[in-house]
Every structure is written in structure tokens, then in C-alpha cells.
Design a protein with these regions (language model features):
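Beta-lactam-recognizing serine transpeptidase/beta-lactamase-like catalytic domain environment
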Residues: 15-23, 94, 215-227, 268-313, ...
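Periplasmic/cell-envelope proteins involved in peptidoglycan metabolism and beta-lactam response
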Residues: 6-8, 14-292, 308, 387-399
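Intrinsic structural disorder/low-complexity segments
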Residues: 9-10, 443
Length: 502
């Protein structure tokens, strides 16, 4: 065996086999450590998952059950049916019929162009407007409200993804413009906005019910999942004092006069003097409550109770009543009309027309009414004096609301009688410088025809429960006595002369 190389001067040789074994042992140990760590991590993760599941399924179970219930269980409204409005003879003036709302869910619709085309054909509306709606990022929106039932059925049959219809009801007015200012109208959600629809909204609308049930992805109730149900209570019905036949005739005649004179507005009222029942009431211009959204505010205004007018010669009858009742004048007293009369620095005049171009001459009280003599009415006013004339006008109801039950009523306008100069007193005696509503004037004239008793005007005769039984009935109400029966009889006879001779 050869010995060490005599020329090697470095360190002694190492036993490499033993070192190799040492390295191999250390690598095995490293693998075992890593495996142990991995197992530990997996166990820890598993424990955390179990803990999280326990937290979610046990500890937080009530919370997530409620969340799930909110997603699948709905409280769905069951709308009450709005009551019907009838005239005094049972003719329907306002009814509720079945309808539907059409909706879309834009975020769910992919082919918006095609859906817009299909829907526009069914709804008969603008494709461009529909497309604008579909391009929005809304989750839900209506594209038609209170549409006819057949439209909803057509949408359902089309099975267009992201669209649908909801059954509902809508208000319809069979007579169109008939008694529109009395009946009023509702908004798209069935809430009374004007007229008696507004005044009696609570009685008409009833109380909505509801059903609690699970729904599917399209919002439809899953059969057999109903948990609770409360039935709706339908609204009550209202019976008016209005006679539709008289109402239609009054509207027709008023419209002819309104157009013939190119008037800015016109009003007519028919009132039963002995009871205060309003049999007919019309205004021009008018509107169709079936299409109220396209009407003007002027056409919807109930001028009969909201507008003040200078009554003019129509007030002379009240001046005559006051003079006779206060015994300031007698039926046989004579007054002279020379066409004009100086009062201080002012002059009042009568309207001159054949055969009275020079004035009305000698007039008794009846002739003052027959010829509508301003000077004669002023002279009666002077005999009464400001205080008594004012108190009679107050008794006739000119300075209080008529309380007819119609919305928007106002009081008449006047100034303090203590401030009336002679010319002011004269003007008021023949109907100038004072403002009243047509309803107040109708109420006052009814007192003359009713033996001197003023009746409370009213338009609602009865409110009925949903089953048709009476809930509330409105009866004639005496407000006060304004004059004696004898004065009433005298003036009533005088007023006949206004028609036959005036």
C-alpha cells in the first residue's frame, strides 16, 4: 500500500462517507419537522372552520334565519277596494275596477333593445322612452300604472324575463265630466286628491290587509307557504244629494251660456230650499277626472265655493228683505228714480234702457226689484242704515263659510260698517263693494223661498258600510231664521215679477 504523497503539504484527508451519512440524517429530520408543521396548520384550520361553522350555525343561527326569512318570506299587501260614490238615485259617479301595474327589472335584462320593442308593442307606448328606462341601473321600476287587465295578461303571456304585472285596482268615473267638481278624483295610488274623494278619503279607502308567505325568485307566492293572512276591509260607499239628470241638464245649459258670452268662468247651483240639499252644481271650465293629470288648475277649481264675486243686483233682494223685516220700509212706499242721484261729491246711476231712458220714475218696493233699480235700492239702504244692513247680510250667511261639505270654502268679504260713508252704504245696498261666493248666494235665496229659514247646504246624503248598511245619514239642518214668513212670502211674490216683467 503506498504511503502518503511525499509532496502533499495540506490538511489530512476527511472521511467523506461518514459526513454524507450525517447530511442525510439532517434532511430526514427537516422533512419530519415540516410535515408536523403542516399537520398542525391543517388541524388549526380545521378547528377554525369548525368553530366558524359552530358560530354561524349555532350562535348566529337566529340572525341568519331572519336574513333568510327576509329574502324568501314577504308581507304582501292586500289592497282594500275603494267604495263607490252614488247619486241620490243610485247612479254610479265613481267606481273601482280591476287593473294592473306593469314593471321591469332593468339590471336583470340583457337584451334591452328586444325587450323595449316587445313591451312597446304591448303597452302601445314609445319604444325610445322604454329603452331609456331599461338602460338605467334600477332594480325595479314601473313602466305603466293602473293599466287595463288585458295588458297585464299580455305581458304575462309574453314571458319576457325581467318584466311582469301586479294586480291592483283603479278609480273610474263613468260620467266623465259629470259632477266632476263635486266628486273630485284620486291619484294613481288611489288617494283622494280633490272634491269629495279627498274629504271622505278615509271612509272610502277602507283598510288594507296582508298575507305573509314565502316567495320564489320572481316574487310569486309558493303554494302552501302562507303563514298569516289578514283580510282587507273594503271602503264604504257614499250617496250624494245630486240628481244626475238635473246635473247633466245644468251642465249643458251652463256650457252654452259660458261659450256664448266667452266668459272666463261660470257657475250654477240648484238647491232644494226646504232641505238644503244640493241637487246640481256645475262650473265652467270643467275637466274629466278620468284624465285629471292633463287638466288645468283653472278647470279643476270649484268656483261655487272658492271664488268671491261682487254680487251686483242679485243682492238687492236681500236689501229689500232687510228693509221690510226691519220695518224701515213698507211694500207701498214710493221711491223716485231720475236715472242718477248725487251722494256728496259722488253720483250713482241706474242702467238706462227702453222704456226707462230717463230713469224708472216712481217705484214701489216690488218695482225696485222688477226693474233692478240702483237708486231705489240705495234709498232703502239709507233708511236701514249701515249697522242694520250689515247685520242682515251677516244673518244671510255672507260672512261665514256655507259649510256645505265641499272643500275649499271661503267666507264673504266686507269691511267694517262703521267705516261706511254714504256712497259706500249706497253701493253695498245694490250689491257693489262686497264679495260673496255663489254657494252663499244660493243659500241666501233659499231662505227667501223657505219662509225665512236658512238651511245648511249639503251634498252628502248618506255614508254606507261595505255591507251596504247605513253608517251615517245627513239630515236637513236649520241654521237660523232671517226673516218672518210674511216677509219671505212678500219678497217671493216680488221676485216672480222680476222673471215675468223685468
Amino acid at each position: 500500500m503506498p504511503g502518503p504523497c511525499p509532496y502533499w503539504s495540506g490538511p489530512a484527508p476527511v472521511n467523506r462517507l461518514s459526513n454524507l451519512g450525517y447530511v442525510i440524517l439532517r434532511y430526514d429530520e427537516l422533512v419530519r419537522v415540516r410535515i408536523k408543521k403542516l399537520i398542525f396548520v391543517l388541524i388549526a384550520a380545521y378547528v377554525l372552520i369548525i368553530a366558524r361553522l359552530f358560530y354561524i350555525q349555532v350562535i348566529r343561527a337566529p340572525f341568519y334565519r331572519e336574513k333568510a326569512r327576509e329574502l324568501t318570506v314577504r308581507k304582501i299587501a292586500l289592497p282594500a277596494r275603494r267604495g263607490t260614490i252614488y247619486d241620490r238615485d243610485g247612479q254610479k259617479l265613481a267606481v273601482t275596477i280591476d287593473a294592473c301595474d306593469i314593471y321591469v327589472q332593468p339590471v336583470k335584462i340583457k337584451d334591452k333593445e328586444e325587450v323595449a320593442t316587445q313591451l312597446s308593442q304591448i303597452l302601445g307606448c314609445s319604444r325610445t322612452q322604454l329603452l331609456d328606462t331599461l338602460k338605467s341601473d334600477k332594480k325595479f321600476t314601473y313602466v305603466a300604472r293602473r293599466a287595463d287587465i288585458w295588458i297585464g295578461d299580455a305581458v304575462t303571456r309574453a314571458k319576457i324575463f325581467g318584466t311582469g304585472s301586479i294586480r291592483t285596482t283603479k278609480r273610474v268615473y263613468p260620467g266623465g265630466t259629470l259632477a266632476a267638481h263635486i266628486v273630485g278624483f284620486t291619484n294613481v295610488d288611489g288617494k283622494g286628491i280633490e272634491g269629495l274623494e279627498r274629504v271622505y278619503d278615509k271612509q272610502l279607502r277602507g283598510t288594507d290587509g296582508y298575507v305573509v308567505a314565502e316567495v320564489d325568485a320572481r316574487g310569486k307566492i309558493i303554494p302552501g307557504t302562507r303563514r298569516d293572512r289578514v283580510e282587507p276591509i273594503n271602503g264604504g260607499d257614499i250617496v250624494l244629494t245630486i240628481d244626475s239628470t238635473l246635473q247633466r241638464s245644468l251642465e249643458h245649459e251652463l256650457e252654452k251660456s259660458y261659450k256664448a258670452h266667452s266668459a272666463a268662468g261660470a257657475t250654477a247651483i240648484m238647491m232644494e230650499p226646504k232641505t238644503g240639499e244640493i241637487l246640481a252644481l256645475a262650473n265652467m271650465p270643467t275637466f274629466d277626472p278620468n284624465n285629471a293629470k292633463n287638466s288645468s288648475a283653472a278647470s279643476r277649481r270649484d268656483r261655487a265655493v272658492t271664488d268671491l264675486y261682487e254680487p251686483g243686483s242679485t243682492l238687492k233682494a236681500m236689501t229689500v228683505c232687510a228693509g221690510l223685516e226691519a220695518k224701515a220700509v213698507t211694500p207701498t212706499d214710493i221711491f223716485y228714480c231720475n236715472a242718477s242721484k248725487g251722494i256728496g261729491r259722488r253720483t250713482i246711476r241706474c242702467s238706462l234702457h227702453p222704456p226707462f231712458m230717463a230713469g224708472h220714475g216712481a217705484c214701489n218696493v216690488a218695482k225696485i226689484l222688477t226693474y233692478s233699480c240702483n237708486i231705489g235700492a240705495a234709498d232703502i239702504g239709507f233708511k236701514l242704515g249701515g249697522e242694520r244692513l250689515y247685520k242682515f247680510e251677516q244673518a244671510f250667511g255672507f260672512y261665514e263659510k256655507p259649510d256645505s261639505g265641499l272643500p275649499g270654502e271661503v267666507r264673504g268679504w266686507h269691511d267694517n260698517w262703521r267705516d261706511w260713508a254714504d256712497i259706500r252704504l249706497a253701493n253695498i245696498a245694490f250689491g257693489q263693494g262686497i264679495a260673496v261666493t255663489p254657494m252663499q248666494m244660493a243659500k241666501a235665496y233659499s231662505a227667501i223661498a223657505n219662509g225665512g229659514l236658512i238651511m245648511k247646504p249639503y251634498v252628502v246624503k248618506e255614508i254606507r258600510k261595505p255591507d251596504g248598511k247605513p253608517e251615517q245619514q245627513f239630515m236637513p239642518t236649520v241654521v237660523r231664521r232671517v226673516m218672518s214668513e210674511s216677509t219671505s212670502a212678500m219678497v217671493s211674490e216680488m221676485l216672480q215679477g222680476v222673471v215675468s216683467e223685468g
